[in-house]
Amino acid sequence: MKIKVSVPATSANVGSGFDALGLAVTLYNTVTFEESDHLEISSADGTRIPRNESNLVYRSAKGLFDKVGKTIPPLKIVQTNPIPMARGLGSSSACIIAGLLGANRMLGDVLNTQELLTLATSIEGHPDNVAPALLGGLTSSVYEDGVVYSVKRDVDQTLCFAAIVPDYKLLTEAARAALPKEIAHKDAVYNLSRAALVPAAFCEGRHDLLAIATEDKLHQPYRMPLMPGSKEVFEMARLCGAKAVYVSGAGSTVMAVAEKAEAEKFYSKLEKGLELLEGLDGCEAFTLLRLDADNTGATVE
């Protein structure tokens, strides 16, 4: 039996919702699983991945087998990975969710969605990417004492997204190391008040709130110095008509949000604008990904 899992890319934090908010977008990693006589892991698109038991898809699948007291059989795993790695688009969460869903289906769907989310969060360490990867939409999550509390809302389909992906990686560890150990009380209030507006802005048609809802003082000011050209990308995206611009996850991708009615004009302007920025401030090139929100989440066939 061959099992195929598709998992969407995710964009965490959404500006103000540091380590709490995330949303899924229409870019998908796919993984197929088949039982075999030996472990065989390959990449269908040439992406360099570990081909042994250190592979995150395999480790996640094994984690589920271990949790239910079963021995994982030898597997043939084939990955297709269009989600760029170490760019703030949830590539590791996609691997974790793929491994868990593949293993869960092999075992007859022994874990429910909440149990899968909890196990995924224990592997990843935080729920802001794994929740939207599994559930789709915009998720608000808390991880407390090993329990995940998560709420999913469908994102307004009149919005479109532009993931502006630079040609350099930013590892999450480095991005987290840049954060201060303490923050000012007023900065916490600044973010809390804006994060409270995010669901209305993204899910209830309040596009007038998109810009203010995604403003941040907790992480972006500290991470953007590690992202050459990001300040200019923010400015360019706004000039081209973006309603909101924020650092996706830990970076290095910048996510811009626009109204779908203006999508073609927005994307065309942005593409030309990014060409003007290439070679500036240590970034040689940008890839522009035209995306929508994914309200379905991961799927298994």
What is each of the regions a protein language model found here?
Residues 1-87, 101, 109-111, 293-296, ...:
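ATP-binding N-lobe of GHMP and related small-molecule kinases
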Residues 11-13, 17-24, 86-96, 124-139:
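FAD-binding core of FAD-dependent oxidoreductases
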Residues 13, 22-25, 69-71, 123-124, ...:
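Solvent-exposed alpha-helices and their adjacent loops that cap or buttress functional pockets
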Residues 27, 89-113, 134-136, 144:
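DPxDG-like acidic metal-binding loop motif
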Residues 35, 166, 256-260:
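Short beta-strand-to-loop capping motifs
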Residues 113-159, 245:
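Alpha/beta catalytic cores of group-transfer enzymes, especially the acyltransferase/condensing modules
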Residues 163-225:
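Active-site rim beta-loop-alpha module in soluble metabolic enzymes
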Residues 202-301:
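Glycine-rich, charge-dense phosphate/pyrophosphate-binding loop(s)
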